[in-house]
Amino acid sequence: MSEKSASNNKAEFKRQSSPFREIISADHPIYKPAKGRYWLYVALPCPWAQRTLITRALKGLAPIIGCSVAHWHLDDKGWRFLEEGDGKTNERHWFDIAGGISSVNLNTSTPVANIPNNAHRLLVDGTDEPHYGYKRLSDFYFKTKPDYKGRFTVPVLWDLETCTIVNNESSDIIGIMNSAAFDEFVGEEYRQVRLVPRSLEAQITEFNSWVYDKINNGVYKAGFAECAEVYEREVTSLFQYLDKLENLLDKKYTDLEAEYGKNNKDKILDRYFAIGDTLTEADVRLYPTIVRFDVVYHQHFKCNLATIRDDYSRIHTWLKNIYWRHEAFQRTTDFTHIKLGYTRSQPRVNPIGITPLGPKPDIRPP
């Protein structure tokens, strides 16, 4: 979410490549599957980090891979962790779906005018770092590579045995978690979860490709544009692809209505997903952007030609279905962290740092 280094000299947003791209597998010479060996470092405002939290929950890996949550405020030194003296962390919080952060259970954001950027409420603003007492995410980057020169991004998948970063690319991390690497440590119900079924792999890959470039990254291309011409081009493109997504989901919903009848909404929603008739990686990758759209991207990134809730009925139905019916999505979504993280951490976009109260509710009832 850092601003300055993310833009090139043509006023266009260019995302930095992730430099750490190892995998975990029984055949890997170093990084082999083990319970308790790996740790996930995230920040809840970040949509890329949320992908990994969702996958960790869906695959039953929360007890296997611990998690620490950075403070929601990203300053010029990067993400930071709370100090242990700010409270007491029970070990079980590290293996919770959202790292023990309490406000994920609220389903709404709270007024934040009286919350300073240096707020230090343990398990509210973030968690401590339990292994080394590190105060900054950057410490992990320098521990792995002392001459590291890049940005300090989340998520980070860390190896406690070798004290190195395994991977800091969210798409790789969800692939590692979705592989069979950790199957021996989870129950059969989680072994059966395959977010990229072989029969749908080509469809999911194609869907993910344009969703990433035009929607996931599209909001950033618009929000971090440094001239009006680039902004207008990127916003127009973004909404063209939201239209494409709406049409895709409309066809899916209409087909399900024809199969089950318009009044049989429970059966329709049981199979109403982006690709196929079960949850897949397509839903995992799409959700973090859509759940943030009305709450921050519409106003903060000026993606304001339309809202999801009022102008994209099929996407909105999909969003509510995913959020309210699937704990892995709901309990990794913290609207207060999301709103604070964007509006307080990007002064070029929002110089005064005022966090809008609306829209309310952050997500509408099912």
UniProtKB/Swiss-Prot annotation:
Keyword hit for Secreted: no
CDD domains xrefs: GST_C_Omega_like
Class of this enzyme: transferase
PROSITE patterns for this protein: GST_CTER (PS50405)
Keyword Transmembrane helix part of the UniProt annotation: no
GO molecular function: glutathione transferase activity
Disulphide linkage map: none
This protein's name: Glutathione S-transferase omega-like 3
Organismal lineage: Eukaryota, Fungi, Dikarya, Ascomycota, Saccharomycotina
Recorded name of the encoding gene: GTO3
